[in-house]
Amino acid sequence: MKFTCIDSFCGAGGLALGLKRAGFEILVSFDASAPAVESFQRNVSPNCLHARAEDLTGRRLLSDAGFEGVPDLFAGGPPCQGFSRQKRGAHLGDARNGLVLEFVRLVSEIKPRFFLMENVEQLGKKRGKEFVDKLNAELAGYELHPFFFNCADYGLAQTRVRFVIVGKSRKIKAPFQLPAPTVKRWLTVGEALADMPEPPADSSVHPALPNHYRTKVTAINTQRFSFVPQGGGWRDIPEELRLKCHQRVDVRSGGWPDVYGRLRLDGQAPTITAGFDSFTRGRYGHPLQERALTPREAARLQGFPDDFHFCGTRRDVRSQVGNAVPPPLGEALGRAILKTLRNEQATYKPRV
């Protein structure tokens, strides 16, 4: 028996890859980014639409999937930059958060047995309460299971915390249980990158590994970074070499602790963002070399296999890697949902 899924706001395909590993058949996907769609089609499935959510309907998605009936899962991670840590005040009215409402609309139209929404940590906190309340009101036919995940608990060498809502149709009687951690000990950066060869010095792509290339660094930044030990940051740089803004900051204040940060081999990476290719944007410095992470290294820390080829410009690739749902997290969530669907099928009644 096949279990079916429609994947929305799919990006390069991290969530879909995890759901496929769990056992779902991905019927159709969509994203507004052409390079992300190209990556998805190359690595996950050719049936991926280059389209905006606002221009799609549930009927259109089911038609493009060639599917009649009720899909088992509607999944996605709609962007909502308005829920950033820096943003204050009301958030649901922020135009940047409109896509989460498009996600709700498509769930209402498609009426899947389950839905899965992955998003930023802040959406599940106080500033996201208005959205969660709206979700409860508009999707009253679903039993909601909101929770937070630390991706390190699911096999990543990264302490990425995400907010996830799983909605189960109230027609399903079998209980849903949140996925338990899949590892007893957190993977370290050193273990994750252990066999990774050094990227070419001229910033070209490594001949054996797609997307494995270094970002060019100025001589002064290379010199600054050479003083930073594993786990260190800008405060380890001699004062005469620091940026002027760092010279004016009291070291004891702890300002910008991750800028010029170097990863520890025996620790975990922070959240991988689209800025991972520069140690001036955060703790993305290689543990042993005077450079930032390559896209391939960042993709490993996100849980992607080495043969997953990200398409587009280097800027496109950064965005796809940093914005991806880690495949191991998608797989853990998919297995938990499938367990409920299989229990329903075996214990209660056949699907219709």
Specify the residue positions occupied by each region the protein language model found:
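Class I S-adenosyl-L-methionine
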Residues: 59-70, 81-253, 257
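Class I SAM-dependent methyltransferase "Motif I" SAM/SAH-binding loop
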Residues: 9-12
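C-terminal target-recognition/interaction regions appended to catalytic cores
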Residues: 212-352
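A short, Lys/Arg-enriched amphipathic alpha-helix followed by its capping loop at the start of a domain
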Residues: 18-25, 43
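Extreme N-terminal starter segment of soluble prokaryotic enzymes
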Residues: 1-5
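S-adenosyl-L-methionine
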Residues: 38-66
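Conserved SAM/SAH-binding beta-strand->alpha-helix loop
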Residues: 33
